[in-house]
Amino acid sequence: MNFNINILGTGGTRPLHNRYLTSVLIEYHGESFLFDCGEATQMSLRKQKISWQKIKVICITHLHADHITGLLGIVMLMAQSGDTRKEPLTIIGPIGIKKYLDANIELLRVHKNYDIIYKEIIINKTEPILYEDKKKRIEYIKLKHSIECVGYLFIEKDKPGKFNTQKAESLNIPKGPIRKTLQEGHEVILNGKKILPSEILGESQKGLKFAYITDTAYFEELSTHIKNFNLVIIESTFKNDLKDEAKKKLHLTAKLAAKITKKANVYQTGLIHFSERYTLNKDLCELLDEAQQEYPNGEIFLTKDGMRLKANKDKFIIK
């Protein structure tokens, strides 16, 4: 299965020497989708030997510096790597993302040899589905932060079951476009008779569901958007002893992050966006322990810079 999740950075506020700012990149069947792009994100791409030219869509959660200041560098990098990029780059984010990037491009006279397609989100007005093709879609959900902020859902569509050749032959379905249409999950009319995909396909395989959630305060409704997701990468900025500060700054503690995914019956929870005050392994282990105590039956782990997760059936395996 060609579905990988790369952790480019796990920190908040500013990059540290061993922890870049929070950013996640999905590789899906030869295409890449980048979520947030803080300062030094391109350094993470280089370190992990990930091609920036394969990035098809960049999704920005909100317009705070630690989630956006690396965006111009990525745009320049794509242009400076020769004329190899042919397709446009889609950039998705809250209102203001276009103004921010266009102003920087104009002021710095950035040369780019490809088009940028902007999709600005007007929360509660923009339709939830932002991107869609035959295999997947990207949706947004409203979060609760000091400025407009969204989380992103990357949803793989269910895959049709195995094609039963013997059954197809017994129904006199010819090889070619008609069989392909059925394999893609669409009904056909053959000799005046309707044939359903279920007649010649085995049981369909459920697509994987992934969510990227940062920065946000706790609110009850959040869990409803990620019900039964396979993997949720969610901010865990503070330990529980700073829960009042988390509430004031509209962030989550590790305990609250686990409470959200527990309520949603999430299969795997990855903690991310750690406060810069937590530089010791001991501190991070305490974050993890607090989350695991809240959701003892869930699979919870600390994300790390450079971590790569590979899809395997209904879960993701750390490589």
From Swiss-Prot:
This is Ribonuclease Z. Belongs to the RNase Z family. Binds 2 Zn(2+) ions. Keywords: Endonuclease, Hydrolase, Metal-binding, Nuclease, tRNA processing, Zinc. The active site is at D66 (proton acceptor). Its EC number is 3.1.26.11. Zn(2+) 2 binds at D66, H67, D215, H273. It is an enzyme of class 3 (hydrolase). Zinc phosphodiesterase, which displays some tRNA 3'-processing endonuclease activity. Probably involved in tRNA maturation, by removing a 3'-trailer from precursor tRNA. The gene is rnz. Zn(2+) 1 binds at H62, H64, H145, D215. It catalyses: Endonucleolytic cleavage of RNA, removing extra 3' nucleotides from tRNA precursor, generating 3' termini of tRNAs. A 3'-hydroxy group is left at the tRNA terminus and a 5'-phosphoryl group is left at the trailer molecule. GO terms for molecular function: 3'-tRNA processing endoribonuclease activity; zinc ion binding. It comes from Borrelia hermsii (strain HS1 / DAH). Homodimer.
